[in-house]
């Protein structure tokens, strides 16, 4: 859904390409930090893995906020805090409350999703991530009374089913293995909670871009993608740092200091990870500002599918019949939406000519 005064298809394509490139390099570093040992423990001889996810999130949020500030200054020569200082008080207060809410939902969503992996298998986790469009539309409808046209609901359903089919047919035997610990219901509740938090985050971000003052005498400062990136990450940085200092000081802060002392390379990897993630977020917030969260989520949930199609084209790999069926549903849905929008755009022109 292109917003009024939003970006062109060229802008969207450039942002999606930038998003995919950032995710690719970012995920390689994420795997390096999370799954590869940095050495052997001198006491036990066992591999030493870095296990302080909150510290990674803190550093990531700090750098993303700084990059968002630079992005604001370069793109509009303005201060992100102007949405608080240059708007009438009710609007500024609503911005502040919304930032508090989405910084908390953003901070809680991923840990809750990862926590669910203790009780449900990885396939269930992947399928939940494939369905991200549904909770966003649900929260939009229930909380903000957003009404979606039938074609958009059909497109969301087509993309979701297509990604699910693609994920199921691509998943390895290992990922389908039952790792249930008898608390599947708890794991599913955590997964659903994570999805709803994502839905609340994305739908609230969409609403923030529409927020305007009611007084005609006051000049209203609109939220931009750069402002949102800077301020949201600053809130996440403060929330996560406070939580780590109060509740996880030994297991996160002290542990990281000791680990970096023994393995300095981990800090370089974390900094690279944070900087690349921050660059990727620039594309995320451009899409949010100029289009909407549904376009963004469609781009992210189809990323793996696009990368596999590229591997087919470039390296001669093969997809099975079910995978091609999933691809057909996804691109059929996206193509149908494009056709509907083209016909809607042509209709006013035809009436004018008559």
Swiss-Prot record:
- What keywords are assigned to this protein? Endoplasmic reticulum, Glycoprotein, Membrane, Sugar transport, Transmembrane, Transmembrane helix, Transport
Write out the annotated subcellular location: Endoplasmic reticulum membrane
Q: Which GO terms describe its cellular component?
A: endoplasmic reticulum membrane; Golgi membrane
What membrane topology term does the record carry? Answer: Multi-pass membrane protein
Glycan attachment sites: 202
- Gene Ontology terms: biological process: UDP-glucose transmembrane transport into endoplasmic reticulum
Chain ranges passing through the membrane: 6-26, 54-74, 95-112, 123-143, 148-168, 227-247, 268-288, 295-317, 321-340
Which InterPro entries does the UniProt record give? SCL35B1-4/HUT1
> What's the chief localization of this chain?
endoplasmic reticulum
Gene Ontology molecular functions: UDP-galactose transmembrane transporter activity; UDP-glucose transmembrane transporter activity
Tell me any Pfam family this protein matches.
Answer: UAA
Taxonomic superkingdom: Eukaryota
Q: What does this protein do?
A: May be involved in specific transport of UDP-Gal from the cytosol to the Golgi lumen. Involved in the maintenance of optimal conditions for the folding of secretory pathway proteins in the endoplasmic reticulum.
- Which family does this protein fall into? Belongs to the nucleotide-sugar transporter family. SLC35B subfamily.
Q: What is this protein called?
A: UDP-galactose transporter homolog 1
Gene of this entry: HUT1
């Amino acid at each position: 859904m292109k917003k009024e005064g939003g970006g062109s298809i060229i802008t969207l394509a450039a942002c999606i390409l930038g998003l995919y490139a950032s995710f690719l390099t970012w995920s390689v570093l994420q795997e390096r930090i999370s799954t590869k040992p940095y050495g052997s423990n001198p006491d036990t001889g066992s591999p030493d893995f870095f296990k302080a996810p909150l510290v990674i999130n803190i550093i990531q949020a700090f750098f993303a906020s700084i990059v968002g500030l630079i992005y604001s200054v370069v793109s509009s020569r303005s201060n992100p805090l102007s949405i608080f200082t240059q708007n009438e008080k009710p609007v500024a207060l609503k911005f502040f409350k919304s930032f508090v809410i989405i910084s908390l939902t953003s901070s809680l969503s991923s840990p809750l999703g990862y926590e669910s992996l203790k009780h449900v298998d990885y396939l269930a986790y992947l399928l939940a991530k494939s369905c991200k469009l549904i909770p966003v539309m649900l929260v939009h409808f229930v909380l903000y009374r957003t009404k979606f046209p039938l074609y958009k609901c059909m497109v969301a359903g087509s993309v979701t089913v297509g990604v699910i089919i693609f994920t199921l047919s691509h998943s390895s035997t290992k990922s389908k293995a039952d790792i249930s610990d008898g608390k599947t219901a708890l794991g599913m509740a955590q997964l659903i909670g994570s999805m709803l938090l994502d839905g609340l985050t994305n739908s609230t971000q969409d609403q923030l871009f529409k927020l305007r003052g009611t007084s005609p005498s006051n000049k209203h400062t609109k939220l931009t993608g750069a402002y949102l990136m800077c301020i949201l990450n600053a809130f996440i940085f403060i929330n996560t740092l406070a939580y780590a200092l109060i509740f996880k000081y030994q297991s996160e802060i002290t542990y990281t200091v000791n680990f970096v002392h023994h393995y300095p390379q981990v800090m370089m990897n974390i900094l690279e990870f944070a900087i690349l993630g921050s660059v990727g977020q620039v594309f995320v917030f451009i899409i949010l500002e100029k289009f909407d969260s549904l376009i963004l989520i469609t781009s992210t949930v189809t990323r793996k599918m696009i990368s596999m199609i590229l591997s087919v084209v470039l390296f001669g790999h093969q997809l099975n019949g079910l995978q091609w069926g999933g691809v057909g549903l996804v691109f059929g849905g996206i193509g149908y939406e494009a056709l509907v929008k083209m016909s809607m755009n042509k209709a006013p022109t035809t009436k004018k000519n008559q």
